[in-house]
């Protein structure tokens, strides 16, 4: 619909240009939007206000000139000029009825467009450290990122999905040490577990598999391991204790044996993450290893570029980045006193490699706890001369899980958390994914487990899926009633769809393509979730007020065409959110 109105306005502007009233006009300036108030028509354009200065006309006068030159169209019932020069369009009912035919003809393709055609997007999301299973907090980032990828693809962008595997650095060493200590316990040793180690049952499971598969690992006593270490918390510094313990175990095991423990821990957890995401309906084009940055020399190259440009300085044996020169609150260490790069150095190299691959846009989806990290990343890239317009860092608030009225506390380090796998087993993938995207990513959300499991109209995903299943049920009744749906005849008699509930449903269907485009461009999958709830509500109201399988063939076929189109749009929308559309419930 918007495209038809856009073309009408373009024709009018071309006429004004030919008459010399407009010297030129840019097609990108033509904007047509749905009105929020139906008393102002169905669509409105502010084009006369945009071009008034260029045309040397008052906006209202230019609006008069544009309206006078609009070609006639059977879908346009009335055109008004309102306020300072808005051009309001009221559409005739056939304009909305025509949407039914479009849906039935285009099927799965309905709602897709070419807005992003020829443009590429690099989308990195989830990227949880492989130090434990994915928990429900990661689930929201997964649902949001995957839905955004699907939406961007639907509007024409070529999307590259990537998971950045943080498989280097201190956290991975803490995991490896935690596994090794549990391994020693299985071998009969008794020793204190570090207060800041990883304590979940999954660590014990990795240790068990390590013991079952590796008989040649060296064995060291608790006395040998603990000798010479500083005190742990509460009497000592837990971080200094951990660092000393890591180095001690590396020395005792040697490079090869330590690497076996490290790889066993990494590969076990990473395999679980891959499996959980696949079951959640999330796939990636690439899993990018942080260690690969070191192997390819990317970190060293990035650091040398910063040094050469004068953006690094030495202090206390470490190399620091002048982040404050680029808007950050303080300078940041990139190379530690021991010569090892920091996580920040790896992230600089990773982002630089992404930017240099030529994508039109780089989107990072991070947990909200990383908000303080944004200024330093942007500062480093600005120092390297990168175009920050390419980079879009989006934050996702973690979901707060409730069981009844009780808030569930979670901590990966202590092992007290609900995994994404457990959540899906309890409420199902569909409920989890829909609930996760029902709020804007930047908004806090409370995840009600009991509501997500309920089969009632209060459960949003059930309500939407039930609308789809209900429509499927109507079509199954055709055979029982000895009716046959004549789709072609239904489309020929769409003019019979003039009841109030039908007009409401037609109007809602006509919005779908615009909602998909807006949800993609604004990075707002929740707009589509809201739309599907509204569409389901309109259908359920229609279902309760009217009989579809009436004896009049033309009316029956037209109504069946309408609900068939509704079914298709619900399925299309749910698919973009990664949710199934069941045919029976």
From Swiss-Prot:
It catalyses: tRNA(Arg) + L-arginine + ATP = L-arginyl-tRNA(Arg) + AMP + diphosphate. It is an enzyme of class 6 (ligase). One of its GO terms (biological process) is arginyl-tRNA aminoacylation. The keyword Aminoacyl-tRNA synthetase applies. PROSITE patterns: AA_TRNA_LIGASE_I (PS00178). CDD domains: ArgRS_core. Keywords: Aminoacyl-tRNA synthetase, ATP-binding, Cytoplasm, Ligase, Nucleotide-binding, Protein biosynthesis. The keyword Ligase applies. Its EC number is 6.1.1.19. One of its GO terms (molecular function) is ATP binding. Signal peptide: none annotated. A motif ('HIGH' region) lies at residues 128-138. It is found in: Cytoplasm. One of its GO terms (cellular component) is cytoplasm. Monomer. Belongs to the class-I aminoacyl-tRNA synthetase family. This is Arginine--tRNA ligase. It comes from Nitrosococcus oceani (strain ATCC 19707 / BCRC 17464 / JCM 30415 / NCIMB 11848 / C-107). The lineage of its organism: Bacteria, Pseudomonadati, Pseudomonadota, Gammaproteobacteria, Chromatiales.
């Amino acid at each position: 619909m918007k495209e038809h109105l856009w073309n009408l306005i373009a024709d009018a502007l071309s006429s004004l240009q030919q008459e010399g009233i407009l010297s030129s006009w840019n097609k990108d300036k033509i904007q047509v939007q749905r009105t929020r108030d139906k008393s102002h028509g169905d669509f409105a354009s502010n084009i006369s206000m945009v071009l008034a200065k260029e045309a040397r006309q008052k906006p209202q006068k230019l609006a008069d000139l544009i309206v006078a030159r609009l070609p006639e169209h059977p879908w346009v019932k009335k055109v008004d000029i309102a306020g300072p020069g808005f051009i309001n369009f009221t559409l005739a009912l056939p304009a909305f009825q025509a949407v039914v035919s479009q849906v039935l003809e285009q099927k799965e393709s309905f709602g897709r467009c070419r807005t992003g055609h020829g443009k590429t997007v690099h989308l990195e999301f989830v990227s949880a450290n492989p130090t434990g299973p994915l928990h429900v907090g990661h689930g929201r980032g997964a649902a949001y990122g995957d839905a955004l990828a699907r939406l961007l693809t639907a509007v024409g962008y070529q999307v590259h999905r990537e998971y950045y595997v943080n498989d280097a650095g201190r956290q991975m060493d803490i995991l490896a040490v935690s596994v090794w200590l549990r391994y020693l316990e299985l071998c009969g040793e008794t020793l204190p577990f570090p207060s800041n180690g990883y304590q979940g049952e999954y660590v014990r499971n990795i240790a068990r598999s390590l013991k079952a598969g590796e008989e040649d690992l060296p064995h060291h006593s608790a006395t040998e391991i603990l000798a010479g270490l500083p005190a742990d918390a509460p009497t000592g510094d837990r971080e200094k204790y951990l660092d000393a313990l890591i180095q001690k175990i590396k020395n005792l095991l040697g490079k090869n044996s330590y690497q076996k423990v490290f790889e066993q821990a990494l590969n076990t957890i990473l395999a679980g993450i891959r499996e959980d995401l696949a079951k959640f309906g999330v796939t990636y084009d690439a899993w990018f290893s942080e260690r690969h940055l070191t192997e390819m020399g990317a970190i060293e190259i990035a650091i040398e570029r910063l040094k050469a440009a004068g953006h690094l300085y030495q202090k206390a044996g470490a190399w620091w980045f002048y982040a404050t020169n680029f808007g950050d609150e303080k300078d940041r260490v990139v190379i530690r006193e021991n010569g090892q790069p920091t996580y920040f150095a790896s992230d600089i190299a990773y982002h630089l490699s992404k930017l240099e691959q030529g994508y039109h846009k780089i989107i990072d989806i991070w947990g909200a706890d990383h908000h303080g990290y944004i200024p330093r990343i942007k500062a480093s890239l600005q120092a390297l001369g990168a175009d920050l317009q390419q980079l879009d860092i989006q934050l996702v608030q973690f979901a707060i899980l409730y069981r009844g009225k009780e808030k569930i506390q979670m901590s990966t380090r202590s092992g007290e958390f609900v995994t994404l796998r457990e959540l899906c087993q309890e409420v199902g993938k569909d409920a989890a994914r829909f609930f996760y995207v029902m709020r804007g990513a930047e908004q806090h959300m409370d995840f009600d487990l009991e509501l997500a499991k309920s089969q009632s109209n209060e459960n949003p995903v059930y309500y939407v899926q039930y609308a789809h299943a209900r429509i499927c049920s109507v079509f199954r009744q055709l055979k029982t009633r000895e009716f046959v749906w004549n789709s072609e005849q239904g489309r020929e008699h769409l003019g019979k769809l003039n009841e109030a509930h039908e007009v409401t449903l037609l109007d809602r269907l006509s919005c779908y393509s615009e909602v998909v485009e807006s949800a993609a461009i604004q990075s707002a999958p929740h707009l589509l979730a809201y739309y599907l709830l509204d569409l389901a509500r309109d259908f359920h109201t229609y279902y309760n007020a009217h009989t579809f399988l009436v004896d009049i063939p033309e009316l029956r076929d037209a109504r069946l065409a309408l609900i068939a189109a509704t079914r298709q749009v619900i399925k299309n929308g749910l698919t973009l959110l990664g949710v199934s559309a069941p045919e029976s419930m």
